């Protein structure tokens, strides 16, 4: 899989190629036992790349479901994955949350702060993605949505006051190397490895994430009041 991004380093964003997408989708199904499904794709139109959905103002061009009942399309079968991407090799790779994992979605700056803090504390991390819209997603065991609000309050923060979103049942995340139009590709900040096959529970990460998001929210309030 892709090289990961260090806490303080940057990396070139790989160009999305159809054959890569198939290979990655198969590995997610075979090696991680994650359900995957094919999303929209990018189409060249008059020198631009537009989403296959046809909306010029699409908020996630080439990186969202093609149908409303997308959950029924998600599969963990490598045979089915090969069949789907064989027909549409440039389709984005989307992963349903709430099945094998949930994702704790935070701003990129808060995510890097939390990542450094968690590594210093030698906490076990699961895979972590970095998106072109400057979000960082930490993969955790399913069931986070029911736990996070009380956990955040326990650490002295109001859930409504910090930018920490749980993606759980009925939602999805885009997987590397899916591209968001011309904005770039989803990347691994911490890639899936045999060592992180067993995902952490939300409790193992929430203190660092809540602290980082709370610190960022406080800084934003200070900027607005100055």
Segments (PLM) and residue ranges:
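Signature for HUH/AEP ssDNA processing cores
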Residues: 2-133, 143, 194-211, 215-226
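Catalytic core of tubulin tyrosine ligase-like
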Residues: 138
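DNA replication initiation modules
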Residues: 143-226
